[in-house]
Amino acid sequence: NVKNICLSGGYALNCVANFKLRQSLPKDINLYVEPVSHDAGTAIGAAKLLYHEMRMLEGITDDPIIPQTTVKYGFQNHYPATYDFARFKKTKVTNKDVAKKLSENKIVALFKDRSELGPRALGNRSILFNPNNSKAKDIVNKVKNRESYRPFAGTILHEDCKQYFDMNVLDESPFMMYAVKAKNYSLKGIRHVDGT
């Protein structure tokens, strides 16, 4: 009679296992994978439970915990925090500007708005590159000082995700908690050896 399953903890960060579990469950069972699946997520859950008990609410909000609920920073905060690592000048950048840089195979570091909570880069603290550029991931791995076998995730508009990825039983993966197969093999810059 279970209709809702929630995964949390370190094992919930296994994107491949999460997707296989979602595929194996009947469609009428909801699977929620906590995007802050580490100690900070436990603290958030404890705070929500205490809030629920103190307020004597009938139910906790249906709103998901969005891993971008922290303080919003402006340029005056960004500049001193990054001055020792990079020199830059203040410029207003639009999504179109970022898209143009990516189309020119430039690597773009996004540092904007609210900090993110959890282990995944979700757009406010992200390193972006053209997913068709197979050499870019080596550069990003070097910048991040990480192993070459580590996978990358694509960022895509919701309405376009099924065109590029085999979402199967999923409608979306907003917090990078599922590994899905890439349909378009031109995405060589982000496609992992297993096709995800």
Residue ranges and their predicted role:
Residues 2-10, 109:
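Short glycine-rich phosphate-binding loop at a beta-alpha junction
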Residues 14, 18-196:
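Flexible beta->alpha loop and helix N-cap segments adjacent to enzyme active/binding sites
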